[in-house]
Amino acid sequence: LPVTSAADHASKLRGAKVLIEREERKTIILEQASRLCAAKGLELVEDIGLLEEVAGLVEWPVVLLGDMDRDFLTLPGEVIRLSMRTHQKYFAVRDPKTKSLAPHFIVVANIEAKDGGKAIAAGNARVLSARLSDAQFFWKVDTATPLYTEERKAKLAKIVFHQKLGSVWDKVERVRALAEELCAATGADQKLVREAANLCKMDLVTETVGEFPELQGQVGRQLSALTNGNRESVAAAIEDHYRPLGPNDRVPTDPVAVTLALADKLDTLVGFWAIDEKPTGSSDPYALRRAALGMVRLITSRGVRVNLFEDVEGGHWPGVVSRVARSITERRAAETIEPERALLPAIVRHAGQERVRAALASIIAPADITDAVLTNLRDLPAFLADRL
């Protein structure tokens, strides 16, 4: 395509059905998709990340509305959306009144077909049907048994969490012990916390999570409610114990979920510090900084009265850190943690204080004032809980 000057570059390409402006392609996709959905009394499920991705894949976006078998709506919405999004780059469509997914999808073609895109939409529907048929089979297998089974427990016991920290089931047992003791601080029902802890990693060995690993926790929540008849707080804790996943992620509100999330992050921090796998510079392969910040957000956002420094150093948490440390040191030399009681304060000061300093400075005080306050402050979480 000959271009004689920079001025006619865009117009020449447009004539050849190439839109060079990314924002224009995004606008066209949104407008056409919204119009097609509105014509059927539906609405587009917003997905900014997918919009960015699709806008970069097409030069001349042509939006089409496809159909899928209504039987697939028996699958969890997260499974349908992930299959559409990850594998096919489709947008989900829902009923604006119920917010439930509709048996349709939006696909963006890169060509204006002579038949108006009917063949393209039909072809994409067949591909999606194959994907969702697999997902439906996996879901049927997973829902045939309760979430907790001895078979799944045995599988977790064979999955290595870390060579020096044992299996995933070893971690579950440590988290359960920590969570039970944390109940006094969080006000959570110990029986429900124990039940949630036993279930929290079970979905890692389900067929559905094997196919869609991004749905860990979410699948467990669904299966817990369906097959175990668990209360909502237990089911929610299975999903929410991973949260917050980052600075912009929501913080759990239910006491059971808060307790389990704290225990899970505490076990991770204690464990990796014990085997000398601390973050260095920009390297943090086990996301320990995120875990530390997550603990701080859980404590401050929920007003949990946990005095991490004084309670541990003063021996007021009998066995909490020692139990984790002992479980770990059985696999390592005794000098791994010396002394055990000094471990947790070191972790919180090193991993958490820098996170707190940055967060505190950004919302309530200049950095120099924050540094002066934190220099002699021992009980960071309690201090923040009283002031944020």
Question: Model segments located where?
Answer:
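Amphipathic alpha-helical "coupling" segments that flank catalytic cores
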Residues: 1-388
